Structures are given as structure tokens and as C-alpha cells.
């Protein structure tokens, strides 16, 4: 389960950017073709946040659909796995153009009133 290590890295990056300020929410974008299971990230998140500025933060995951473009005819198609066949010409020469993402889209920190 490589998602544990990925989650730990996400938390480390967000904690570093938060500079000690408690984090309320983290939003990730995870592509369906990224080989990262969003449910596993959700499972690991609360456990990995314990004792950090992210403890108690909510996690939002936006799943990005897979899309490919045929290198032969230019047709764009939906992909549900990292390979496929062009709907128009039958070619297997597809370029993945969307769905391999893993991004920290945003984080929300607590306001500090001085």
C-alpha cells in the first residue's frame, strides 16, 4: 500500500507550507489513472495527521477522469485504464492527456487574529 507513504508526503508538504498554523482543510486532485486509490488516502489521512498541524483537518478529494487522445486520428476518448482503443479508428496509439494527476489543489488554514 504505497498510499501510506504518499499520504505522509502530502501531510509533510502541507505542514511545511502552513508554517505552524493549524490546517482546517486539504483538497487533493487524484486522477483515476494515477494508480493511487483515493479511498486508501482517505483511510490513511486521519492517522497520519495525528500530532501535526493537520490534526482534525478535513480531506476533500476531487477525482479526475481519465482521457486520452488518439495519435493517429486525434479523437479524444474517455479512459478507465491506462490503455485502450480509439473509438473512431480502432488505433491503440493513445496519449494520456488527463487522469494521472496527484495535486494538492488547496489548503485552508485557521485565521490568526492578532
Curated annotation (Swiss-Prot):
Primary role: Involved in the maturation of [NiFe] hydrogenases. Required for nickel insertion into the metal center of the hydrogenase.
Keywords of this entry: Metal-binding, Nickel, Zinc
InterPro entries, alphabetized: Hydgase_Ni_incorp_HypA/HybF_CS, HypA/HybF
Protein name: Hydrogenase maturation factor HypA
Family: Belongs to the HypA/HybF family.
GO biological process, one term: protein modification process
Molecular function, one GO term: zinc ion binding
Residues the entry annotates as binding Ni(2+): 2
Organism from which the protein derives: Rippkaea orientalis (strain PCC 8801 / RF-1) (Cyanothece sp. (strain PCC 8801))
Keyword check for Metal-binding: yes
Binding site for Zn(2+): 70, 73, 86, 89
Amino acid at each position: 500500500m504505497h498510499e501510506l507513504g504518499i499520504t505522509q508526503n502530502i501531510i509533510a508538504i502541507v505542514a511545511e507550507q502552513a508554517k505552524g498554523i493549524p490546517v482546517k482543510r486539504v483538497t487533493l486532485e487524484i486522477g483515476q489513472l494515477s494508480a493511487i486509490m483515493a479511498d486508501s488516502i482517505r483511510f490513511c489521512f486521519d492517522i497520519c495527521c495525528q500530532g501535526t498541524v493537520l490534526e482534525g483537518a478535513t480531506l476533500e478529494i476531487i477525482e479526475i477522469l481519465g482521457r486520452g487522445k488518439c495519435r493517429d486520428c486525434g479523437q479524444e476518448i474517455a479512459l478507465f485504464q491506462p490503455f485502450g482503443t480509439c473509438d473512431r479508428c480502432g488505433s491503440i496509439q493513445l496519449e494520456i492527456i488527463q487522469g494521472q494527476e496527484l495535486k494538492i489543489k488547496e489548503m485552508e488554514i485557521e485565521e490568526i487574529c492578532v
